[in-house]
């Protein structure tokens, strides 16, 4: 791995992300000798606010059956005792400097951030470098935090109808790939992790060569690169990063499951269709289809199922783009006395209609206007800019983001129809119904 980095010409590589007419801010990027990629996105807004992020290229996608949820557990452990910090001291230091911090674990990556004033840049870098190299893994802290995670699993998944339905959906939709479980993991795995399991996961994946340091906001790139060199350049890598080799087999038929759960007499439906990687050219059209079907009260499914037929109390549709095969998801909650099968029948009817009849140009224009507005809004704060850019850098390809506006502008009604025909295929659908 290091031989590869030695071939890279070191130094600042200024990457302009502004194509003609683009509203994306510019970014600058540098790769340190140990492989850590440092990205700076100055916003020039004189806000004196920055967000310092460390993205690790590891999520539940990198776990194995029997050890699910470890990436999320490590996120919890990462704020415990280190060589130079007591448990809780990280949070206290951030609080004392007037900042806020948090973390999240997804299917594809883990994100840590500190939002602070610009003058606290170096302290934020120092804190994150400490977590990367000096976490101590004390058994008593591990045991108590495991209990916290188990309670989170109960609260967000087992005892919440929507959370449980979502978890069981992925259990059904993916049979081989680690997307088979959501980042919280299975309860039996949570109960049976060892401290060494979590420590080994940290040693394997929390390495400079597997991380992105990203700072956005009112900041000078030179200060970030200088600070990154000071605090991170001497952290050594410990070994090769294992590649995810599992690929979900092509789905060769309908998958359906029925779940018994106390839902208060209300029936729930979730339906999904496999989609390609986040890098695929069809992603913009899939996002638009999500807006057409479920993006707001005037979208097709809410207007038909909720307003006209009064079958559902809520219905949504959206596209999940991931490193490997993603998912286009539709979720509906029935009104009292309405069966999930009735919801399913009407949803499939509307999908087939979309595939047979192109949406109007006026509908597409409205989607483009709303999407552009949301996109511009996402570039207003250091936090949202970091989240947007970081989600592409950490998954290994920034180009889909750089091309996004151009691809949205060129999107036409026939493309939407063709992409709907290509992916919203009934005999490749996964459907779960939950009822008492």
Regions found by a protein language model. Give the residues of each.
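Positively charged n-region of N-terminal signal peptides that target proteins for export
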Residues: 1-7
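Boundary at the C-terminal end of the N-terminal hydrophobic targeting segment
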Residues: 19-21
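Bacterial N-terminal signal peptides
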Residues: 9-17
């Amino acid at each position: 791995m290091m031989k590869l980095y030695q071939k890279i010409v070191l130094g600042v590589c200024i990457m302009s992300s502004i194509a003609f007419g683009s509203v994306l801010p510019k970014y600058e990027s540098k790769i340190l000798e140990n492989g850590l990629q440092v990205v700076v996105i100055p916003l020039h807004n004189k806000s004196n606010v920055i967000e310092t992020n460390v993205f690790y290229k590891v999520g539940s996608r990198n776990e194995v059956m029997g050890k699910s949820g470890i990436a999320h557990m490590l996120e919890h452990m990462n704020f415990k005792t280190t060589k130079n910090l007591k448990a809780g001291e990280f949070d206290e230091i951030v609080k004392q400097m007037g900042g806020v911090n948090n973390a999240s674990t997804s299917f594809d990556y883990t994100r840590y951030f500190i939002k602070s004033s610009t003058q606290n840049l170096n302290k934020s870098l120092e804190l994150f470098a400490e977590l990367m190299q000096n976490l101590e893994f004390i058994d008593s802290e591990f045991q108590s935090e495991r209990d916290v995670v188990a309670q989170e699993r109960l609260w967000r998944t087992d005892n919440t109808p929507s959370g449980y339905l979502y978890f069981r959906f992925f259990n059904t939709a993916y049979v081989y790939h680690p997307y088979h479980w959501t980042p919280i993991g299975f309860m039996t795995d949570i109960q049976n992790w060892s401290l060494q399991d979590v420590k080994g996961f940290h040693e394997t994946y929390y390495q400079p060569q597997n991380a992105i340091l990203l700072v956005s906001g009112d900041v000078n790139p030179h200060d970030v690169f200088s600070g990154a060199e000071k605090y991170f350049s001497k952290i050594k890598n410990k070994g090769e990063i294992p590649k995810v080799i599992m690929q979900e087999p092509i789905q060769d038929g309908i998958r359906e499951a029925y779940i018994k759960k106390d839902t208060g007499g209300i029936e729930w439906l979730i339906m999904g269709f496999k989609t390609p990687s986040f890098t695929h050219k069809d992603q913009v059209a899939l996002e638009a289809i999500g807006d057409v079907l479920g993006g707001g009260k005037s979208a097709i499914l809410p207007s038909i199922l909720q307003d006209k037929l009064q079958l559902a109390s809520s219905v949504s549709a959206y596209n999940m783009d991931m490193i490997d095969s993603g998912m286009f998801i539709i979720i509906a909650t029935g009104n009292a006395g309405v069966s999930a099968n009735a919801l399913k029948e009407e949803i499939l009817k509307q999908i087939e209609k979309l595939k047979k009849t192109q949406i109007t140009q006026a509908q597409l224009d409205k989607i483009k206007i709303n999407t552009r507005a949301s996109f511009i809004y996402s570039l207003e704060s250091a936090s949202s800019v970091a989240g947007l850019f970081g989600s592409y850098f950490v998954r290994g390809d920034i180009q889909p983001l750089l091309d996004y506006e151009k691809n949205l502008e060129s999107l036409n009604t026939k493309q939407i129809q063709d992409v709907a025909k290509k992916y919203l295929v009934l005999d490749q659908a996964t459907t779960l119904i939950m009822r008492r």
